[in-house]
């Protein structure tokens, strides 16, 4: 697992976050998104939102950690990652509300974005503590 985490070390420190952010923006703002047939499970859309914005929080945590592998990122850095990811989630929902592109605003999407960012942000710290810090 350590080798997998360190494979990104040769890339710029912000690269993982930018890639995840671009994917999220395409999936959430494109008027003709990739058509994925999700199973007809109640709440699957909210789960996907949580995973997307939790993934953004995780990638921000990884990018912060990559600056110094000798010390685990602090709780403050995790909170910053959660806040950034949550702000992006709220912004995306507001853009969906204001831009007539066939997308709709949902308050529960924002809740799912924030919960996903919180859970996976702290999970990133746990995983980095176990596998990443030297």
Model-derived regions: residue spans:
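Bulky hydrophobic segments
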Residues: 1-108, 114-134
């Amino acid at each position: 697992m350590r080798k997998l985490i360190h494979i990104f070390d040769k890339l710029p420190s912000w690269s993982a976050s930018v890639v995840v952010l671009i994917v999220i923006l395409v999936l959430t703002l494109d008027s003709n998104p990739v058509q994925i047939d999700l199973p007809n499970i109640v709440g699957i859309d909210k789960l996907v939102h949580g995973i997307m914005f939790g993934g953004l929080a995780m990638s921000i945590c990884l990018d912060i950690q990559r600056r110094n592998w000798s010390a685990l990122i602090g709780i403050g850095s995790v909170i910053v990652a959660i806040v950034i990811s949550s702000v992006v989630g709220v912004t995306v929902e507001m853009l969906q509300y204001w831009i007539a592109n066939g997308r709709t605003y949902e308050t529960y999407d924002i809740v799912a974005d924030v919960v996903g960012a919180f859970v996976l942000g702290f999970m990133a710290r746990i995983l980095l503590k176990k596998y990443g810090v030297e």
